[in-house]
Amino acid sequence: LPKILEVRDRVPEVMRIKEGANYILMELGPRRETFIEYTVECPLRGFYSLGPVTVRIQDAFGLFHKEKELHVYNDFLVFPKMEDLKETFVKSRVPKIFTGAVNIRQPGPGSEFYSLREYFEGDSFRAINWSAYARSGKLMVNERERDAVSDIIIIVDSRAVAETGPVSRNALVYSTRAAASLAKYFLGRRDSVGVIVYGDEVVSVDRDTGKKQLYVILTKLAGAVARGNIPLQVVVNRILPHINKGSPIIFLSNLEDDPTIVNALRDFRARDFDVTVLSPSSLEFEFDAKRLDRTGYEVMKTERDVLIGELRGLGVNIMDWEPDMLLSTALAGARGF
């Protein structure tokens, strides 16, 4: 009598099988091959493994069987979900504030005067220097000093308090998604992006450009774990000497349980850094999940509003990021658009 072979691939509980199946039934025979094909959907970023594989052999009547577990694993990484920042965002005034361009002493597109040269066919008439033409009788054009790409610094709060709320809706989930989306956007603009993630230690990705840099950043964000309680002031003291003047700072945090936040951001502002804070509120996540009563919510919301007002008074661009708000909306709100 033929025997039936069942092969089953173990899938992590947080994943949902979107297409296909993670098991197959087949008749056992010589030199037979088969494939298990399925698509999984994972709502949470992180490192995962498929496996082990369970193999069960049973008779045609299903009365007897033998089962063995094969320790075969496939490891893979789930990046944070990213929001596309559309062309309308690029045309707004928000990214102009983020340019942070510096001159590199070469002619090219830019804002500062570099030199005069003779007019060539195809040059813009707007570039003609009419005063030089009046003096020399020759058409001369202004060359500009080429602007280099920006240095963008993204800081992600990964302290233990960042995981307050449901596992799929908390400040760390929103912050890592925002950091990934912003990194993709700025790198796509050929800017230089660096990322700092801090919790029980300070993990940094040095500033760089290109697709490889995006992969490095996404890998760090995928592995971010909520733990520890390093104050923001420690992070600021460590990175301040290494940040170029004019680099925009984007800080992603729920702003909770850290008495150093105001002074730390004041240090940035005192050195004339442009600071944007997007703050996913753990209060909203807890209240929506009915883990916080109305009275407690109102008291803590008032304290949070006072803190946000104090940071605005320092010249920090800040947005209280509500759970259902798109990143582009939150960013535009922080910048006052």
Question: Where are each of the predicted segments found?
Answer:
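Von Willebrand factor type A / integrin I
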Residues: 89, 243-249, 255-337
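Residue-level detector of flexible, active-site-proximal loop/helix-junction positions
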Residues: 137, 159, 202, 228, ...
